[in-house]
Design a protein with these regions (language model features):
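Helix N-cap / beta->alpha transition motif
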Residues: 38-47, 140-144, 193-194, 236
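Assembly/oligomerization interface modules of large self-assembling protein complexes
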Residues: 1-49
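Short loop/turn segments at secondary-structure transitions that flank enzyme active sites
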Residues: 43, 78, 104, 144-146, ...
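Sequence/fold signature of self-assembling virion shell proteins
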Residues: 1-4, 96, 100-115, 150-246
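Ordered core of a single globular domain
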Residues: 118-155
Length: 246
């Protein structure tokens, strides 16, 4: 929504409509993706999990099932996060991520060859004023974030880091958070803008709607199926900033 208002003198009577509101629309193009995995409990024989393997019929329980499934879900979450930022719909199992959506449509900032701090300042100053709100953030990869932290420590700016384990910190002199996101790992990109400018679309009540784990008597194996639809979109790409680090 683009809103333009005009304040008028109200000394007299009457009604003089001025200003406008324009509704813009950008479509989310979700992609249906899935994960299918299969487990044969006999393959666990000879491993640390073998003592829980029950071969007898009617004992269809996968040893350490909770740990197996929990690890799969963690990896699915990591893969989705990376795709949210770096995905390309031309790649199987991926949808266009934020970087792809912003390609050629966002503002750009220049990397400073001598200082990560100066690079972040360049990103901040490249933001249009309309994008500098309470929910504005600068998103960086873990490798950039950690290098910036070390640079600040070398400058004896310990006071800006309230918690050594924090994943975000205010950019000095601004109200903008610098946030470390794993989804940007290896991208050599920095993204800045309002959080409310980015939208994620899923198919039903959550982002992993179909989740089935069962024992197949036909093949005598355990099977896992996860299927969901996911997509991202940016309402106003020209209010975002992308900085390339290479």
């Amino acid at each position: 929504m683009n809103t333009d208002i005009t304040l008028q003198d109200a000394e007299g009577c009457g009604f003089d409509p001025q200003g406008s509101q324009t509704l813009t629309q950008r479509y989310i193009e979700p992609k249906v993706v899935k994960l299918n995995m299969e487990y044969c409990d006999k393959n666990l024989l000879g491993t640390w999990a073998q003592y829980q393997v029950k071969i007898a019929a009617g004992k269809e329980v996968l040893p350490f099932e909770e740990q197996f499934i929990g690890d799969v879900i963690a990896h699915v979450n990591d893969a989705v996060e990376k795709t949210v930022w770096q995905g390309k719909k031309a790649t199987a199992g991926e949808f266009d991520g934020i970087l792809e959506v912003l390609k050629g449509a966002s503002k750009t900032a220049t990397k400073d060859e001598t200082s990560n701090w100066k690079t972040l300042q360049n990103v901040y100053f490249a933001l249009p004023q309309v994008a500098k709100k309470e929910d504005t953030a600068i998103f960086v990869s873990p490798e950039f974030y950690e290098a910036w932290i070390q640079e600040m420590i070398e400058k004896n700016m310990f006071h800006i880091f309230p918690n050594d384990a924090a994943n975000s910190v205010k950019l000095p002199g601004t109200s903008v958070d610098v946030i470390k996101v794993n989804g940007l790992t290896g991208s050599n990109k920095i993204v800045a803008g309002r959080k409310s400018n980015v939208y994620i679309g899923v198919d039903m009540s959550n982002d992993k709607e179909t989740f089935d784990f069962w024992y197949s008597k036909d093949d005598r194996v355990f099977r896992l199926a996860i299927e969901f639809s996911f997509g991202v979109q940016v309402a106003f790409p020209d209010q975002m900033v992308v900085c390339s680090l290479v």
